[in-house]
């Protein structure tokens, strides 16, 4: 949920005017909730309705935030970006395609029987299991989940010889009635047939890297693999961007050198976004909360907001095709 001040910033209105709109329009599905400071909190669905009231909406996109290098924050940033996008009015789905299932562990509602969850293994093994029947409400407002399990490693046996261009694309047709605006694929740090399908199905791929040579090489390989797969299977190349994650002291010479190398190597694909390394983020994940609950450094929140502007931008409805 977001405050009236934050909603006002998105709609270019004052907090007072946001309160007026909430009181004047009973069809916004708003039930007043306040925190301990008596601040009004606006849920995701109400924020989406406010956007529509002002002839605005979230631009629909399918997204990946990952590269072929583990430990650079891909899953954490997927989760934080998904939660923030939902707060801003997006209806968000996170499809966990990583057998490690960290996104599932974080998002899974406490009262759900995990043993009954259908994952990509069952979805691709049995055509009678449609994707819409696998969607769960997560613990976070406006965020939904298709879960993963460790056994999902076996799914690759089902996909031998399959065209990755069509694997996920066909399954997504089952979701057309659910009106998701923003879909995230959380992937393992490998280029399997299923993750390949997710990369070339996405509208935008954001590749995080740290300042290490391994991280930079992972981003480079991921970009090359996506482009080669798109050429091989005659798929449109998604928008591919690279950004610096887990950035330590930016005054250090090694970080500056890495940044300059990234800019030279990736050119216009390099985003001017640096996600700072902060214990607040680790603590939030370990506590099962987002960085927008409780204490977290503002520079981290601001950097995540920049990612949200890319994967879930808000535009005039007339500009959205």
Q: Residue spans of the language-model regions?
A:
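P-loop NTP-binding core
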Residues: 3-5, 9-10, 15-16, 20-23, ...
């Amino acid at each position: 949920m977001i405050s009236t001040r934050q909603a006002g910033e998105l709609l270019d209105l004052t907090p007072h005017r946001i309160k007026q709109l909430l009181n004047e329009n009973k069809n916004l599905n708003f039930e007043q909730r306040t925190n301990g400071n008596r601040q009004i909190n606006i849920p995701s669905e109400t924020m989406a309705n406010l956007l529509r009231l002002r002839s605005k909406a979230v631009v629909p996109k399918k997204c990946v935030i990952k590269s072929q290098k583990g430990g650079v924050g891909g899953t954490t940033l997927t989760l934080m970006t998904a939660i923030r996008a939902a707060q801003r009015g997006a209806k968000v789905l996170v499809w966990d395609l990583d057998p490690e299932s960290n996104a599932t562990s974080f998002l899974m509602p406490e009262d759900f029987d995990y043993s009954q969850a259908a994952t990509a293994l069952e979805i691709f093994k049995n055509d009678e299991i449609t994707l819409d029947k696998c969607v769960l409400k997560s613990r976070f407002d406006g965020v939904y989940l298709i879960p993963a399990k460790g056994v999902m490693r076996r799914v690759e046996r089902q996909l031998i010889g399959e065209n990755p261009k069509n694997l996920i694309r066909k399954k997504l047709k089952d979701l057309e009635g659910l009106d998701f605006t923003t879909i995230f694929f959380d992937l393992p740090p490998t280029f399997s047939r299923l993750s390949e399908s997710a990369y070339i199905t996405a509208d935008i791929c954001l590749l995080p890297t740290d300042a290490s040579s391994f991280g930079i090489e992972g981003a480079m390989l991921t970009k090359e693999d996506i482009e080669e797969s798109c050429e091989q299977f005659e798929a449109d190349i998604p928008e591919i961007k690279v950004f610096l994650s887990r950035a330590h002291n930016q005054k250090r010479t090694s970080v500056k050198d890495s940044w300059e190398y990234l800019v030279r190597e990736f050119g216009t694909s390099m985003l001017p976004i640096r996600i700072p390394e902060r214990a607040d983020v680790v603590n939030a994940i370990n506590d099962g909360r987002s960085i927008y609950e409780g204490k977290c450094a503002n520079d981290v929140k601001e950097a995540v907001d920049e990612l949200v502007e890319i994967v879930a931008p808000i535009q005039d409805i007339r500009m959205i095709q």
